């Protein structure tokens, strides 16, 4: 039957496109369903670039995921002849007097250094003087501690998703777009039914990677584990010294300038030349939103506030006359880590909310692990740290 498969993947963003590709690669009859036409700009996997780094300050349990993901990105580049992953280095820095919680860590730079040492990841530890000498683009306070990882860089999220979806289709996978999954139900004979706004589909296993819509599919029992926050991505023009911001001279960065969550800045080099500007943004967790009713327009006052408080004081060459801006949704768990687990009442349905604002770099490995789970193969990475029961055991 056309609507029956071995596996159904609900949501084809970062994790879902990876799972669909891996399942098709393994010869599975797989159907993927997405409410939009990915890659799209309605969820969490858009905006031209995503930082990737091997030493993970959020916890050592993430490092094997990103290491395996990097291998898969290379495989995808070879298979598609597309540039997906650029290693131009990453600088992570913070004042040593700052101890606020950022991505679940109160000592993010130090935790990153520890992870690098534990896993043998090439890196340098820099003081403020050395950071200033190498990267005069930053206005420092003088007591910063820096971590530089030459093998880090950025991914092209839309290209990564598109590459995996195209390969999945070529390998026999089916990607159904502009169709909304409404309900997932266990059937009496051991199959799982996925009901959409158009059809009903059935499979032995279902993978739910629905991003900010995940709790709407899983139900009220799971809703409090997933808080959705609206984020703003901004591209600012360079007023001067354009040559200092090329990927060859300016790394991706994470800069913690204060104790509040919104004091974590991140950004990228001018990947499209001076006219493309710099993508620099912060993270905000002021209020949760409904993904179906979130304001998508970014106001001038939002941009002005971000620039005046965070961008202008720290980047003297960046102008406040922003080029463009868009919104992005973060799905955040209680401990800012991932949740990857099966349903309590359905061992043949696995869900992955692998985001919390730092998920894309891990998505290729998680997609592979989800595919291996669905086909009952041994996993290459350990997903046990991301089980839901950690919140009550």
Q: What label would you give each PLM region?
A:
Residues 2-15, 31:
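Beta1/beta-strand and adjacent pyrophosphate-binding region of the FAD-binding site
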Residues 20-25, 81-87, 200-201, 205, ...:
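Active-site substrate-recognition segment that forms the wall
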Residues 24-45:
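Glycine-rich FAD pyrophosphate-binding loop
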Residues 49-134:
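Dinucleotide-binding Rossmann-like beta1-alpha1 core, especially the glycine-rich loop
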Residues 64, 98-108, 147-167, 295-303:
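Short beta-strand to alpha-helix junction loop
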Residues 129-133, 154, 288, 301-379, ...:
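Flavin (FAD/FMN) cofactor-binding core of flavoprotein oxidoreductases
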Residues 147-205, 209:
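Helical element adjacent to the flavin cofactor pocket in flavoenzyme catalytic cores
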């Amino acid at each position: 039957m056309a609507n029956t498969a071995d596996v159904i993947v609900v949501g084809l963003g970062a994790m879902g496109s990876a799972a669909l590709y891996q399942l098709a690669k393994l010869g599975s009859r797989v159907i993927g369903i997405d409410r939009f036409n990915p890659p799209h700009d309605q969820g969490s996997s858009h905006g031209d670039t995503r930082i990737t780094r091997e030493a993970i300050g959020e916890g050592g349990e993430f490092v094997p995921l990103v290491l395996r993901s990097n291998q898969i990105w290379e495989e995808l580049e070879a298979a598609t002849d597309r540039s997906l992953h650029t290693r131009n280095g990453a600088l992570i820095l913070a004042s040593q007097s700052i101890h606020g919680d950022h991505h679940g860590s109160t000592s993010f730079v130090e935790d990153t250094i520890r992870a690098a040492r534990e896993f043998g990841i090439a890196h340098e530890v820099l003081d403020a003087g050395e950071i200033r000498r190498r990267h005069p683009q930053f206005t420092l306070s003088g007591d910063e501690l820096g971590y530089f990882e030459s093998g880090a860089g950025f991914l092209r999220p839309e290209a990564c998703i598109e590459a995996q979806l195209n390969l999945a289709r070529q390998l026999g996978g089916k990607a159904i777009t502009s169709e909304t999954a409404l309900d997932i139900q266990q059937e009496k004979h051991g199959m799982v039914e996925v009901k959409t706004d158009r059809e009903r589909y059935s499979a032995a296993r279902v993978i739910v990677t629905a991003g900010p819509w995940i709790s709407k599919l899983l139900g009220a029992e799971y809703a409090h584990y997933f808080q959705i926050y609206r984020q703003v991505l901004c591209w600012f023009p360079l007023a001067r010294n354009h040559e200092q911001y090329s990927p060859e001279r300016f790394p991706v960065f994470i800069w913690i300038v204060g104790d509040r969550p919104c004091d974590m800045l991140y950004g990228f080099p001018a990947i499209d030349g001076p006219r493309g500007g710099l993508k620099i943004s912060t993270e905000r967790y002021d209020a949760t939103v409904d993904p179906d009713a979130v304001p998508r327009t970014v106001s001038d006052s939002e941009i002005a506030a971000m620039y005046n408080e965070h961008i202008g004081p720290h980047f003297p060459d960046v102008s406040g006359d922003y080029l463009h801006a868009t919104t992005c949704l973060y799905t955040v768990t209680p401990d800012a880590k991932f949740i990857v687990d099966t349903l309590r009442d359905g061992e043949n349905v696995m869900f992955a909310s692998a985001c919390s604002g730092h998920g894309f770099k891990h998505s290729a490995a998680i997609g592979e692990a989800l595919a291996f789970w669905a086909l009952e193969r041994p996993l290459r990475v350990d997903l046990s740290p991301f089980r839901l029961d950690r919140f009550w055991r």
